[in-house]
Amino acid sequence: MHNTDVIIIGAGPVGLFTIFQAGMLGMKCHVIDAQETVGGQCITLYPEKPIYDIPAYPKIAAEELIKQLEFQAAPFKPVYHLNQHATDLNKQGDFFEIRTSKNTIIKSKAIIIAAGAGSFGPNKPPLANIEDFEGKSVFYFINNKSKFAGKNIVIAGGGDSAVDWAISLSEIANKIYLVHRRDKFTAAPESVRQLRDIAETGKIELVTGYQLNALDGNNGTLQTVIVKDLQNNIRKLDANVLLPFFGLKQDLGSLANWGLDVKLHHIEVDNSYYQTNIEGIYAIGDIAHYAGKLKLILTGFAEAASSIHHAYIRVFNGQALHFEYSTTKYGERK
């Protein structure tokens, strides 16, 4: 049995920043994550993906961001319980008790759920025999950008992942086709502007109004990606690689059975302190939903600060918390 001030579920960027915020208030944390390492999707799915909306970093790789967040949290000595899921929740008076899939038991007065998309996997396009090409020519995640150097690549999708990877891989690929069923992209406007600028150079060809239709190749080696528009017009794209980016399947797993207000794979929270319908349990980051929610890492950082400050009052039996700037707090620690 472990006793702690706060249990954090999820060790992605928002979970890691929550450790720091808790530490600044003198709160001890135990952290549960299903992956073997910290970092969440940033490490598991796209360690080399450039992130553009972190203050003071015009551009930073996901892996580097996680490294810095882990370093920032380290002085507060968090206890990580990795490669295990939070399974059972029990309430005993003012305390919560969580049991994990490895029978680890942790007790605290506050829980911060920063589980991102929960358990995740790719939404795969419904193409015949696509599994024959997976891992050889078809990839849903990128963890080694260099292996795509000099390739002809088809990227399918219209969101941030598709657009950002098209921009990034255009630096090393021979040719990129970006296939999207509409001419309008849902990525950040500045990213779309960069995409269209690069398209004018010919490094990226925008294949809009089309959807994936079939794959052609031998022994897992892709030769052609066939696309079709609404009028059944066919185009054959000469390609070595297909990168379908159609988002992730979300599964909250055991969290869905805890009595939380869950809608469409998200946890409903108030938009003041991000508390759920169960007092003492908070949800922040991509897993949380409230009116006006923006799914940004930056938003999750702000939610971490607000929720942990509110949790402090519960953890320390109503003790008032007086706000101080980080420079003052660090000065006191030294």
From Swiss-Prot:
Top-rank taxon, per record: Bacteria
Cofactor binding comment, as recorded: Binds 1 FAD per subunit.
Pfam families registered for this protein in UniProt: Pyr_redox_2 (PF07992)
SUPFAM superfamilies according to UniProt: FAD/NAD(P)-binding domain
Cofactor dependency: FAD
Catalytic activity: 2 reduced [2Fe-2S]-[ferredoxin] + NADP(+) + H(+) = 2 oxidized [2Fe-2S]-[ferredoxin] + NADPH
Molecular-function GO terms, alphabetical: ferredoxin-NADP+ reductase activity; flavin adenine dinucleotide binding; NADP binding
EC category name: oxidoreductase
HAMAP family, sorted: FENR2
Recorded family membership: Belongs to the ferredoxin--NADP reductase type 2 family.
Protein name from the UniProt record: Ferredoxin--NADP reductase
Organism: Rickettsia akari (strain Hartford)
